[in-house]
């Protein structure tokens, strides 16, 4: 009876408690077995098995859902656990549940050779930074058509703008470089793309979409506030 009276009071007082079903493409972060199944279903429906690391994908999706000020249903994942010789950048259309792009992408020259193993948020480090970003506006600069990135994680990537970390095309990110040197060329910390595909990718992800740069680094996982709840359950 007490519960009934409380319920009547809440309704009459105008209090509304929303109940929503969890979804891998939604903006909520609700941890439940059904939600994990939903993410697995999304992964399967996009036919990502053998193409995308599921652990990286799930982290990217969970972070995407937790970032409320995103303006696009587009998610970009860069998987730095893979070598530069492999296509390790993925762009997903979360609304229509499909992968739009899969491309090579360079890492910072001081992050490693073929593999990126060291990361930094410091100016002049010439290293890549992990974590979640929001894309902003484009401009034409020294590297041509470029996309500004806003690092969302304090102490991890929040100096991205100060460091001029942007998405841009570069000749050293072209596939032909791999044939000559055994790995892709490296940037000063930017996620640089092959020149032929850089503009289409930038246009697809600009204007407030989420980007997640992943690597298997325990120190990042320990520091990330965006993924703290997720990692405790994985």
Task: Tell me what each language-model feature is.
Residues 1-29:
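Bacterial Sec-dependent N-terminal signal peptides
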């Amino acid at each position: 009876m007490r519960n009934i009276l409380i319920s009547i009071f809440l309704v009459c007082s105008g209090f509304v408690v929303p109940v929503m079903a969890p979804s891998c493409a939604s903006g909520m972060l609700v941890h439940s077995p059904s939600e994990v199944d939903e993410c697995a279903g999304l992964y399967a429906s996009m036919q990502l098995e053998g193409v995308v690391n599921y652990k990286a994908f799930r982290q990217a999706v969970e972070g995407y859902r937790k970032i409320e000020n995103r303006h696009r249903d587009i998610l970009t994942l860069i998987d730095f656990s893979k070598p530069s010789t492999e296509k390790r950048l993925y762009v997903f259309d979360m609304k229509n549940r499909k992968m739009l792009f899969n491309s090579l992408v360079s890492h910072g020259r001081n992050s490693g050779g073929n593999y990126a193993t060291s990361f930094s948020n410091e100016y002049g480090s010439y290293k890549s930074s992990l974590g979640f970003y929001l894309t902003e506006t484009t401009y034409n600069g020294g590297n041509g058509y470029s996309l500004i990135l806003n690092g969302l994680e304090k102490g991890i990537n929040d100096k991205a703008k100060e460091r001029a970390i942007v998405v841009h095309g570069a000749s050293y990110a072209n596939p032909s470089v791999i044939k000559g040197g055994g790995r892709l060329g490296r940037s000063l910390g930017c996620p640089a793309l092959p020149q032929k595909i850089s503009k289409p990718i930038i246009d697809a992800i600009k204007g407030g979409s989420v980007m997640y740069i992943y690597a298997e680094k325990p120190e990042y996982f320990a520091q990330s506030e965006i993924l703290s709840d997720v990692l405790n359950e994985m």
